[in-house]
From Swiss-Prot:
PANTHER family hit by this protein: PHOSPHOGLUCOMUTASE (ALPHA-D-GLUCOSE-1,6-BISPHOSPHATE-DEPENDENT), PHOSPHOHEXOSE MUTASE
Stored NCBIfam families: glmM
Disulfide pattern: none
InterPro entries, sorted: A-D-PHexomutase_a/b/a-I, A-D-PHexomutase_a/b/a-I/II/III, A-D-PHexomutase_a/b/a-II, A-D-PHexomutase_a/b/a-III, A-D-PHexomutase_C, A-D-PHexomutase_C_sf, A-D-PHexomutase_CS, Alpha-D-phosphohexomutase_SF
Annotated HAMAP family: GlmM_B (MF_01554_B)
EC number: 5.4.2.10
Keywords noted in UniProt: Isomerase, Magnesium, Metal-binding, Phosphoprotein
Protein name as annotated: Phosphoglucosamine mutase
CDD domains (UniProt xref): GlmM (cd05802)
PTM (free text): Activated by phosphorylation.
GO annotation terms (biological process): carbohydrate metabolic process; peptidoglycan biosynthetic process; UDP-N-acetylglucosamine biosynthetic process
Length: 455
């Protein structure tokens, strides 16, 4: 199958506005179809088991109930993990030897959105081929899946022990505790809200928290990895060594140094990658990144005898490259960092522990560790368009991109790509000065708006 066009699945599962485009009816059908596809190779002498987690969105309970009903209706038992992070679900699928896992989350998106992420029994996100199979069943004019009765039905039960197993795993990924470390923690009012104080207390760190009081509506609202400004203020006022901001489902991390400056995914990958390389643990001395990583990141790697392989945007593509070529560190500027030695997906809490471990082992401040990455000014503009793919291929837009790249003469770059989850075209540029990057982005964005007939 050369190119798979998916109707429901985007780059990170099924997303939509809860109860509008992502309805409980759709969640129920996804439970039936996804459950049937993912458990078809389960042992025949016992019922398949699927684990289900969610973030703190008010719609999470509604969608979880519907999804679970779908699983139960095809004879699958369900373990409810409750509010938990996405990487915890990926870990627990393997740890509990479940047949599949599901997380109800829209990650860093606003509270009105929600989504459904599937994991196979190996803890990895699904391939395009598997998602296509699920979609074919979803759109089938007739539901031919089994409808067992009586003891053939699945049974759902709570499994609060999952969080404890996950935290125990995390603590074993560093060979020391965090005594003597002072940090500020921002849980984005999301899935890490309850885990953060428990985990860092267990590791003997001194910490202050924010964004750990979810009410179902305040997830990612002015807090978390997409809004680290408030955390930066807390870091400075509390005089701690670092700030750690997570997103709504806990699969990404953005850090803040002791001065309140942002340490993004590029810098985190560089810091941890350099440390791993010096210890002989960075496979092939290579970090896998996406096309969104900054030029300064690549220059810092090269200066310290490391290289990088680029992929399309999305941690699933980073992971695919890591598996294919045997790399063990990769991620995105946005803070999805994958430590393949321990995990099958990006994990904000795991990343936080690795970063703090480097700080503790080296005795260096976070600002000192990040200083090697001299970031080129970068600007990203999101433009709402009706057809993001068509506009990306528009001749006038392509001509303007070529014109800008010629003017850059190699000292800068342009990236124009459609969003994987929203009806947006993203226009990004990097250049030596802020003035130049503003000029380049606005030149391209103006043509995009003109061709898309948007103001």
């Amino acid at each position: 199958m050369s190119e798979i066009k998916l109707k429901y699945f985007g780059t990170d599962g099924v997303r939509g506005i809860a109860n509008e485009t992502l309805t409980p009816e759709l969640a129920f059908r996804l439970g039936r179809t996804g459950g049937a596809i993912l458990t078809r190779h389960a042992e025949s002498d016992k019922k398949p088991v699927v684990i289900v987690g969610r973030d703190t969105r008010i719609s999470g309970d509604m969608l979880q109930q519907a999804m679970i009903a779908g699983f139960l209706s095809v004879g699958i038992d369900v373990l409810r993990l409750g509010v938990i992070t996405t990487p915890a679900v990926a870990f627990l699928v393997q740890n509990l030897e479940a047949d599949a896992g599901v997380q109800i989350t829209a990650s860093h998106n606003p509270a009105a959105d929600n989504g459904i992420k599937f994991f196979g029994k190996d803890g990895f996100k699904l391939s395009d081929e598997l998602e296509y199979e699920i979609e074919q069943l979803l759109d089938s004019p007739e539901d031919t899946l089994p409808r067992p009765s009586a003891n053939g039905l699945g049974v759902a039960s709570n499994y609060p022990e999952g969080a404890l197993k996950y935290m125990s795993f995390l603590q074993k990924t560093i060979p020391t505790d965090l005594s003597g470390m002072q940090v500020a923690l921002d849980g984005a009012n999301g899935a890490t809200s309850d885990l953060l104080p428990r985990l860092f207390a267990d590791l003997n760190a001194d910490f202050v928290t924010m964004g750990t009081e979810p009410n179902g509506l305040n997830i990612n609202d002015g807090v978390g990895s997409t809004h680290p400004e408030a955390l930066a203020d807390l870091v400075k006022s509390s005089e701690v060594q670092a700030g750690l901001a997570f997103d709504g489902d806990g699969d990404r991390l953005i850090a803040v140094d002791e001065n309140g400056d942002i340490v993004d995914g590029d810098k985190i990958m560089y810091i941890t990658g350099k440390f791993m390389n010096e210890q002989g643990r960075l496979k092939h001395s290579t970090v896998v990144s996406t096309v969104m990583s900054n030029i300064g990141f690549y220059k810092a790697l090269a200066a310290h005898d490391m290289t990088s392989v680029k992929t399309a945007v999305g941690d699933r593509y980073v992971m695919a490259e890591m598996i294919k070529s045997g790399y063990n560190l990769g991620g995105e500027q946005s803070g999805h960092i994958i430590f393949r030695d321990w995990a099958t997906t990006g994990d904000g809490l795991l990343t936080a522990l690795q970063l703090l471990y480097v700080m503790k082992e080296t005795g260096q401040k976070l600002s000192e560790l990040a200083a090697d990455v001299q970031v080129y000014p970068q600007k990203l503009v999101n433009i709402a368009v009706a057809d993001k793919v068509a506009i990306q291929k528009n001749p006038a837009v392509l001509a303007k991109i070529a014109e800008v790249e010629a003017e850059m003469a190699g000292d800068g770059r342009v990236l124009v790509r459609p969003s994987g989850t929203e009806s947006l075209l993203r226009v990004m540029a990097e250049a030596p000065t802020t003035e130049l990057v503003e000029k380049y982005v606005e030149a391209i964005a103006a043509v995009v708006r003109d061709q898309a007939n948007v103001s």
